[in-house]
Amino acid sequence: MGKDKLHVNVVVIGHVDSGKSTTTGHLIYKCGGIDKRTIEKFEKEAQELGKSSFKYAWVLDKLKAERERGITIDIALWKFETPRYQVTVIDAPGHRDFIKNMITGTSQADCAILIIATGIGEFEAGISKDGQTREHALLAFTLGVRQLIVACNKMDTCKWSEDRFNEIVKETNGFIKKVGYNPKAVPFVPISGWHGDNMLEETTNMPWYKGWTKETKSGVSKGKTLLEAIDAIEPPTRPTDKPLRLPLQDVYKIGGIGTVPVGRVETGVIKAGMVVKFAPTNVTTEVKSVEMHHEQIPEGLPGDNVGFNVKNVSIKDIRRGNVCGDSKNDPPMEAASFNAQVIVLNHPGQIGAGYTPVLDCHTAHIACKFAELIEKIDRRTGKVMEAAPKFVKSGDAAIVKLVAQKPLCVETYADYPPLGRFAVRDMRQTVAVGVIKSVDKTEKGGKVTKAAEKAAKKK
């Protein structure tokens, strides 16, 4: 794997039977991090089970099964390379918590690949009012995934028909436009994830296909295959210039070292000697050292999963869901309340003021009350449709005032995207998603450790 290649994260979305696993499996199998030994092992098992038509989806099923059982998988298995990028598939849906993962997800996707089955009836099912295709695309857009690639899969099942492809492009264009994407900036690639047509190499089965084009602010790019479309993703900018925000995933107590919080740097930089503040617990202390993969590093940057050692802080003072920031540069604070744009995905009844589901925002998992429904809006244009509605139901978008039932630290989506989007969970499913528009922060005194005071004097 090329160490120096730029990393991009993609999420693969689409209807249940669109062929997501086969297509993703194919890319990982052909350009990825699965070593020959593992592949041979899988092939042997497949033959023993009479699955000798060993196809790529099986690679993914194996990986998924291991992941479901909680075996941590060598993450390289979910990676593949293009000429420019090292690509990580963040999550292939079909996973129970796909929607939740996409929102609180360990990483933000830079691009979504929407897989559409072109078979007669299949396409129509996926794109119908309640189809997952629509929900996934809406979700990706709401959560700030601004780049999209559409792969029209299973072209072999419709005899590689140009008319069918054009019909699907036309329909899909209409629907992604409604969601908010600009169809001109979206490459459409006709593929067969099973046979491999237009995946890595140009197909000979569709002589009519002249290639895809996409127009963005940075110009026009063209290509033939899905791999080329992925290679044409606009390089993401990582927010190192923003103040530090690091939501804690865990806090460990390590003998001889002390308290070690662990989490992913979302914005900014963390380094030894910094005086950091944890919100909403309001503890301020000095960072003694930062490490990644059990090695000390000079600094942790956005996207890095780091552990850092803090002085004079007990494991009781800080916990998962707390947010670490620089005490001298826009430190994080507790949110007394916050206003958010919420889109209701699937709730069986009506949601009114007083509704108190659980919110998953970054690593926090806390009950929040819908204190007030401020206005109902058109989710595409943002125009107000009704002031102070009594209720909202599935499909509606509204601006809502939320109050956490326990201390919580969140930020606006505009300032700190990963801390400004959330999933609303109830009845063991994601009933809504939200993007935070404004936060009412509370100032209150907290614990300042001796180490922090000393560090402050040194300066």
Curated annotation (Swiss-Prot):
Residues 5-240 form the tr-type G domain. It comes from the Eukaryota. Residues 14-21 are annotated as: G1. GO terms for cellular component: cytoplasm. GO terms for molecular function: GTP binding; GTPase activity; translation elongation factor activity. Residues 192-194 are annotated as: G5. Residues 91-94 are annotated as: G3. Keywords: Cytoplasm, Elongation factor, GTP-binding, Methylation, Nucleotide-binding, Protein biosynthesis. The modification N6-methyllysine is found at residues 3, 30, 316, 390. Changing residue 222 to R: In strain: B-3501. Pfam families: GTP-eEF1A_C, GTP_EFTU, GTP_EFTU_D2. Gene3D superfamilies: P-loop containing nucleotide triphosphate hydrolases, Translation factors. Residues 153-156 are annotated as: G4. Residues 70-74 are annotated as: G2. NCBIfam families: EF-1_alpha, PRK12317.1. HAMAP family: EF_Tu_A. This is Elongation factor 1-alpha. It comes from Cryptococcus neoformans var. neoformans serotype D (strain B-3501A) (Filobasidiella neoformans). The gene is TEF1.
